[in-house]
From Swiss-Prot:
Cell location: Cell membrane
Superkingdom, taxonomy of origin: Eukaryota
Protein name: Protocadherin alpha-4
Annotated PXXP repeat ranges: 734-737, 774-777, 796-799, 829-832, 870-873, 888-891
Annotated region described as Required for interaction with FYN, given as residue ranges: 738-947
Gene that specifies this protein: PCDHA4
Biased composition (Basic and acidic residues): 906-920
Parts of the chain on the Extracellular side: 30-697
GO molecular function terms attached to this record: calcium ion binding; identical protein binding
Residues carrying covalently attached carbohydrate according to the record: N139, N257, N265, N548
InterPro entries: Cadherin-like_dom, Cadherin-like_sf, Cadherin_CBD, Cadherin_CS, Cadherin_N, Protocadherin/Cadherin-CA
Region (6 X 4 AA repeats of P-X-X-P) residue spans: 734-891
Length: 947
């Protein structure tokens, strides 16, 4: 054969066409090989690994394997060189019977990732089977009266091969009576017969021996023979004849037994017994046909007597002969072709080829989970199978190859929502009614650490009494993780920071597994009121996830500090205070004031004063204010009173149990002409206006100098602390001593170790500077007042009832407070907040300075809030100082008191916020009212209480 190439352009087109065909087959995922049947073991078939595009080194790691349907082991792959070879004997006739096409279908499966390739190996036929006749000898009885050209059917030979190897040619041994009629193209293979060419003469030749030879088309040719023994009969001249020589019938599979297939009819021109016909199956039909069908010998009806299955056989060929009853019976023949029609009687078959389980919850979309193979033995629409999946699941089925589906991930997974899926795959054919089959698979979702531990709330408030034993359990934190196994194993730890000069871990610890929080040392309310820190919960996943929770531990106060006496300004030996009192003083004259502080808070720091009875039961003309500590006279003094008195004042707090301290005051009675101590509260004798003015100026200068000095000192100290403080958040340190505020109606005692003691992790505490200016007339007004003896009082201004102390001012207040209504403790996210109502009355108490105690024990005075209700405090006269003013930047209130001669000064408290309106109002007073106001001042000796 010669090939003549045209132009170069045609060559390129042909080459491009071949490349496109190769690429199409490669993309289709199929390979085609061919091998001859009966090939020896080890015969080379093809380089399958190379043709699939796989490297030899990855065959074993990717679990390269070959699977075939039905018959395994015929072909195998050498994993060392990737060659497909013959492993065992291949017999095409056994494998495919007489099918025109015979292939071995292989499935090549590799993992990581999962891939499936289809390989078809065509089995080529070789001429290894000779033609075979049903019998080696056939006997024929032919009447001598048969006319010429009579036809006598013969059973042809069969060849197990196909194609040209099964293409048979027949030849008859030479004779003068018969010739061989070969089948034409439009007839079936078995249309072979003898044609009578010369009349028979029984007397001349009673028997005729012929040999029929069948030769196939293979190379080399193979032959088969059958001996024909023809017996010449005498008499009956007419044989039965059927209406048609070939009948074709369609029959549904699965029809019940007794179903009529066809009714045959044959006729015989003879009469009598020679014309009676008996129907029967030819002896040449297979036993399988005889087991499926039955023919009635009289009527010629063929009925079903066995199970007809389309999948077993698609058609049946039945040879029927009609024989008359003549002495020399004659026969006629016909063929019945029964074509079986398919019925949808087979359910689809499902099989999971490969599973990749469990699947991670973070698997990307499109991940292949399983490979599903479906098949149906029916044909046509009845064998067309479609698959469906359970609805409302994050998976879908994707058709990959013919009768193959891939189960892939369609949407994101969340193990915390659904940890496993029960999937049901339904395969349904296209028949009517449709048949279906199901297969289920459980898909477990593997956990991924995608959930951090979560606390029930972002922060907790814990209350712990001070002086707790070391190692006591104060709280338990608990976090929950929605993940599983190690990803849900939660451990707890502290977020380390510094509290003052010490590490947080020296105060508290947390158990890593249980989350229990322990106090490692006794807590001191006076040192640390609030300890704020964070606890971290972290799981054991990779990478680990964590979250924090804030704990606010409030240290509750206990009465563990006794009242402490403050040194008197005049001093006294042995802790005793000495006072000189004129004999001429009247009732309620203030002799001295006992000052005490308590480091505790609330009721534990609320102090009361009691005067111990004198020795021998003698009555003494003095009393002490229950809450003010002021010692005053109960009556006018006379000669019966002792000139010296030793007073014992018991200072007691309101804790449980109460703690006490005792102060000693030595009172000496002197004549009016003797000068009393400067510390005395009362001035004896009448002092003129000039002397009073001098005293006022002296006290004013002292106060201004003290305030200025304290302000400068506070600013310097604050600057030094800010510069030297370590850059730690939430540091706490003991504060500096504070001052004491006192008046005739009560005493406010402040801890000597106080600073804002609330520790948190949000930054250093803020410093609130609040300036309270005393309501004093300016220098110009004072000069005008020195030139006149008339004084005027301005109208009293009421403080703002909504005013509150600042945070730094409240943090330093730890003493008894002049209040009469109950306080309310409210616990919020930032800690307890106590509000104390105001004093509702400014009437002097029956006993100097006594007030009703606040309701509720254990209240933290650091969070007291003072309200000043409506009242009528008296305005300070000219040259007088207000009772109190507050040093900026300090929680202390300074008491400055000036008493005119023979009278008791008014006790009015003034708190202003930088406003200097009092002096302006004094200028606007009319001079006509000065005389009347002076008279009212002289007659008024009543003290007003703080509002």
């Amino acid at each position: 054969m010669e090939f003549s190439w045209g132009s170069g352009q045609e060559s390129r087109r042909l080459l491009l066409l071949l490349l496109l065909l190769s690429a199409w087959e490669a993309g289709n995922g199929q390979l085609h090989y061919s091998v001859s049947e009966e090939a020896k073991h080890g015969t080379f078939v093809g380089r399958i690994a190379q043709d699939l595009g796989l490297e030899l080194a990855e065959l074993v790691p990717r679990l390269f394997r070959v699977a075939s349907k039905g018959r395994g082991g015929l072909l195998e792959v050498n994993l060392q060189n990737g060659i497909l070879f013959v492993n065992s004997r291949i017999d095409r006739e056994e494998l495919c019977r007489r099918s025109a096409e015979c292939s071995i279908h292989l499935e090549v499966i590799v993992d990581r990732p999962l891939q499936v390739f289809h390989v078809d190996v065509e089995v080529r036929d070789i001429n290894d089977n000779p033609p075979v006749f049903p019998a080696t000898q056939k006997n024929l009885s032919i009447a001598e009266s048969r006319p010429l050209d009579s036809r006598f059917p013969l059973e042809g030979a069969s060849d197990a091969d196909i194609g040209e190897n099964a293409l048979l040619t027949y030849r008859l041994s030479p004779n003068e009576y018969f010739s061989l009629e070969k089948p034409s193209d439009d007839e079936l293979v078995k249309g072979l017969g003898l044609i009578l060419r010369k009349s028979l003469d029984r007397e001349e030749a009673p028997e005729i021996f012929l040999v029929l030879t069948a030769t196939d088309g293979g190379k080399p040719e193979l032959t088969g023979t059958v001996q024909l023994l023809i017996t010449v009969l005498d008499a009956n001249d007419n044989a039965p004849a059927f209406d048609r020589t070939i009948y074709k019938v369609r029959l549904l599979e699965n029809v019940p037994n007794g179903t009529l297939v066809i009714k045959l009819n044959a006729s015989d021109l003879d009469e009598g017994l020679n014309g009676d016909i008996i129907y029967s199956f030819s002896n040449d039909i297979s036993p399988n046909v005889k087991s499926k069908f039955h023919i009635d010998p009289i009527t010629g009806q063929i009925i079903v007597k066995g199970y007809i299955d389309f999948e077993e056989s698609k058609s049946y060929e039945i040879i029927v002969e009609g024989i008359d009853k003549g002495q020399l019976p004659l026969s006629g023949h016909c063929r019945v072709i029964v074509e079986v029609e398919d019925n949808n009687d087979n359910v689809p078959d499902l099989e999971f080829k490969s599973l990749s389980l469990p699947i991670r919850e973070d698997a990307p979309l499109g991940t292949v989970i399983a490979l599903i193979s479906v098949s149906d033995k029916d044909m046509g629409v009845n064998g067309l199978v479609t698959c469906s999946l359970t609805s409302h699941v994050p998976f879908k089925l994707v058709s990959t190859f013919k009768n193959y589906y891939s189960l892939v991930l369609d949407s994101a997974l969340d193990r915390e929502s659904v940890s496993a899926y029960e999937l049901v795959v339904t395969a349904r054919d296209g028949g009517s009614p449709s048949l279906w089959a199901t297969a289920s698979v459980s898909v477990e979702v593997a956990d991924v650490n995608d959930n951090a531990p979560a606390f029930a709330q972002p922060e907790y408030t814990v209350f712990v009494k001070e002086n707790n034993p070391p190692g006591c359990h104060i709280f338990t934190v608990s976090a929950w993780d929605a993940d599983a196994q190690e990803n849900a194993l939660v451990s707890y730890s502290l977020v380390e920071r510094r509290v003052g000069e010490r590490a947080l871990s020296s105060y508290v610890s947390v158990h890593a597994e249980s989350g229990k929080v322990y106090a490692l040392q006794p807590l001191d309310h006076e040192e640390l009121e609030l300890l704020q820190f964070q606890v971290t919960a972290r799981d054991a996943g990779v990478p680990p996830l964590g979250s924090n929770v804030t704990l606010q531990v409030f240290v509750l106060d206990e009465n563990d500090n006794a009242p402490a006496l403050l040194a008197h300004r005049a001093g006294g030996t042995g802790g005793a205070v000495s006072e000189l009192v004129p004999w001429s003083v009247g009732v309620d004259h203030v002799v001295a004031k006992v000052r005490a502080v308590d480091a505790d808070s609330g009721y534990n720091a609320w102090l009361s004063y009691e005067l111990q009875p004198g020795t021998g039961g003698a009555r003494i003309p003095f009393r002490v204010g229950l809450y003010t500590g002021e010692i005053s006279t109960t009556r006018a003094l006379d000669e019966t009173d002792a000139p010296r008195h030793r007073l014992l004042v018991l200072v007691k707090d309101h804790g449980e149990p109460a703690l006490t301290a005792t102060a000693t005051v030595l009172v000496s009675l002197v004549e009016s002409g003797q000068a009393p101590k400067a510390s005395s509260r009362a001035l004896v004798g009448a002092v003129g206006p000039d002397a009073a003015l001098v005293d006022v100026n002296v006290y004013l200068i002292i106060a201004i100098c003290a305030v200025s000095s304290l302000l400068v000192l506070t600013l310097l100290l604050y600057t030094a602390l800010r510069c030297s403080a370590p850059p730690t958040e939430g540091a706490c340190a003991p504060g500096k001593p504070t001052l004491v505020c006192s008046s005739a109606v009560g005493s406010w005692s402040y801890s000597q170790q106080r600073r804002p003691r609330v520790c948190s992790g949000e930054g250093p505490p803020k410093t609130d500077l609040m300036a309270f200016s005393p309501s004093l007339p300016d220098s110009r007004d004072r000069e005008d007042e020195l030139q006149t003896t008339e004084e005027s009082f301005a109208k009293p201004r009421q403080p703002n009832p909504d005013w509150r102390y600042s945070a730094s001012l409240r943090a330093g207040m730890h003493s008894s407070v002049h209040l009469e209504e109950a306080g309310i403790l409210r616990a919020g996210p930032g800690g307890p907040d106590q509000q104390w109502p105001t004093v509702s009355s400014a009437t002097p108490e029956p006993e100097a300075g006594e007030v009703s105690p606040p309701v509720g024990a254990g209240v933290n005075s650091n969070s007291w809030t003072f309200k000043y209700g409506p009242g009528n405090p008296k305005q300070s006269g000219p040259g007088e100082l207000p009772d109190k003013f507050i040093i900026p930047g300090s929680p202390a209130i300074i008491s400055i008191r000036q008493e005119p001669a023979n009278s008791q000064i008014d006790k009015s408290d003034f708190i202003t916020f930088g406003k200097k309106e009092e002096t302006k109002k004094k200028k606007k007073k009319k001079k006509g009212n000065k005389t009347q106001e002076k008279k009212e001042k002289g007659n008024s000796t009543t003290d007003n209480s703080d509002q």
